[in-house]
Regions:
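Signal-transmission linkers at sensory-effector interfaces
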Residues: 1-31, 170-185
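Glycine-biased flexible loop/turn sites that connect beta-strands or occur in inter-domain linkers
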Residues: 51, 126-127
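Short beta-strand-to-loop transition segments that serve as allosteric relay/switch motifs
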Residues: 132-141
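Amphipathic alpha-helical "output/dimerization" segments
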Residues: 143-160
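Signal-transducing coiled-coil/dimerization helices and immediately adjacent hinge/linker segments
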Residues: 166-217
Length: 217
């Protein structure tokens, strides 16, 4: 069985490979991303804003405001729900009334989440790497279309920042290993029809590696 079994398990494996291929896992503390989440917190007038990358077992925050943690387990992540639908913004007006989150420790504990708005950050193929989210400790009655449009713009900018640089040689090797492992999982579980997409990611990274070698020669 796939690690994230369910109707979309194969696509989740491919999405995780896209996270590796993007190079975002090496972008902790990136100043441009930090400025962007600070801007989001100001514009939405919330105490918490974060860029959350959803990996296999965790969500990780390369940039955030109002959180004193670098990562959490995926099983309590709001953003893990948001990446399931990469073309939609996830809206939670009052987490205490949402059966997905009412017992979540981020809701019942000191973080005290009530309002959550999370827009998927997508790679060039439309796969969600994570989200840009804004969070409040008080519930809200509604969000406006202008709010949604603004968060989409900020999330699109975050994606541009993440995808702009080429993946470094070290991170590329880590990505190649990670994607190769994902291919093995698909083959093991009889999902060979997803291998072509992962193989295309591998080829893109290998072309980068070849360009690096040519520049150095």
């Amino acid at each position: 069985m796939l690690a994230n079994s369910g109707p979309d398990a194969k696509q989740e494996i491919i999405r995780q490979a896209a996270v590796y291929a993007s190079g975002v896992l090496s972008m902790a503390g990136d100043p441009a991303l930090q400025q962007l989440v600070e801007q989001a917190a100001r514009e939405f007038q919330v105490p918490i804003a974060a860029l959350s990358i959803v990996d296999r077992d965790r969500q990780w925050f390369p940039a955030c405001v109002g959180l004193d943690m670098e990562q959490t387990s995926r099983e309590i992540s709001f953003c893990a729900h948001a990446v399931i639908h990469p073309d939609q913004i996830m809206i939670v007006l009052d987490a205490t009334l949402d059966p997905r989150f009412s017992a979540n420790p981020f809701v019942t504990g000191p973080t005290n989440i009530r309002f959550y708005l999370g827009c998927p950050i997508r790679d060039r193929d439309g796969r969600a790497l994570g989200t840009l989210c804004v969070i409040d400790v008080t519930s809200r009655a509604r969000v406006t279309e202008a709010d949604l449009d603004r968060l989409r713009d900020l999330a699109r900018h975050a994606g541009d920042i993440i995808l702009q640089p080429e993946v470094s040689a070290r991170d590329r090797r880590q990505a190649l290993d990670g994607i190769s492992g994902q291919i093995e999982v698909l083959i093991r579980d009889g999902e060979e029809d997803g291998v072509d997409e992962l193989d295309a990611m591998l080829r893109r990274l290998e072309r980068q590696e070849e360009r690096d070698r040519q520049r150095k020669s």
